[in-house]
Amino acid sequence: MKYSDTRIYKLAKESQRLAQRVVPPYSSKFSKRTYTQDQHIAILCVRVKARQKLRDMEELLINMPDVQQVLGLSWVPDYSTMCRAMKRLRTKILSVLLYLTACVFPSQGKASIDATGFDKRHSSKHYVRRCKMILGSMKTTFIIDTDSLAILGVHMTVTRKHDTQIILPLFHKVLKSFRIRVLPADKGYDDQKVRDELRKFGVRPLIKHREYGSLDKAHNARMKKEDCGQRSKSETVNSVIKRKYDDTLHTRSYWNQCKEILLMAVVHNMEKGMNIVTVIYWRISTKLCFCKI
């Protein structure tokens, strides 16, 4: 297999192409113009895929001449350059990249929501205390499309916010870009205000009631198992992201940790999109196939 067929090579090429649609080549007119912004974003995406720290990326890129060539790097940026690029990168840009990667997939309006946690063990205890971070992990909530398993929206917090306080802001954010008809969720999102708000926008809430009495059991029995079972797909996406891209955040500042999670979501969607493109390519191929009968 050629190196150009590997997933890291394709990911670097695709992430740079998408970044060129979102950001200008240089962040300022006073820039030294050594590296472009799309090159920095592509390197950060490769870092997520390779599960490496920023300090180890310089050595990794030196051993990848094909990736250097496809990104147009005359020489590899050092650790401090990549740290500054990560710090300058705005979360709005990553949100636009997440939207562009999620638009590739056909959707029927079926979504699901669930929360998970990413460990912040690399953050110092003094920083955790000073910033009033109660949890030792970053609580992350994903809204996914149940047909394609693509991530539509992300919410991050380090405080003890309840699920019912997170679902509506994240839902309104996703609804600006995507159409949602059905939204299953677990009992942690059980709140009548949440149900009323979802119905106001034409969304059918499939949120099971906490069973305090016979009426709650009757409400849960009315829900179809096929529809409520789609909620487990959001747990599948949480598990896939943690296994493929690591469940530990290596950056220390809060905003860099948010960017790290957004980069994981962007890379997840891009890899899903590359699988679809590969399948379509093989389906429309005009090569003759001979088989023995």
Regions found by a protein language model. Name each.
Residues K2-K49:
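Basic, short loop/linker segments at the boundary and entry of helix-turn-helix/winged-helix-like folds
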Residues Y26-R33, V70, M156, T251-S253:
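A short glycine/serine-rich beta->alpha loop
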Residues K32-D38, K49-Q52, E59, M82-F201, ...:
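Polybasic low-complexity intrinsically disordered regions
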Residues R55-L71:
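DNA-recognition alpha helix
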Residues N63-D66, V76-R84, G213:
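Short, conserved phosphate-binding/catalytic loop or strand-edge motifs used
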Residues H162-I166, K217, T286:
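A short, polar/proline- and glycine-enriched secondary-structure boundary/capping micro-motif
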Residues K187-Y254:
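Helix-centered, glycine/charged polyanion-binding patches within enzymatic domains
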Residues E226-I293:
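Basic, amphipathic alpha-helical segments enriched in Lys/Arg and hydrophobic/aromatic residues
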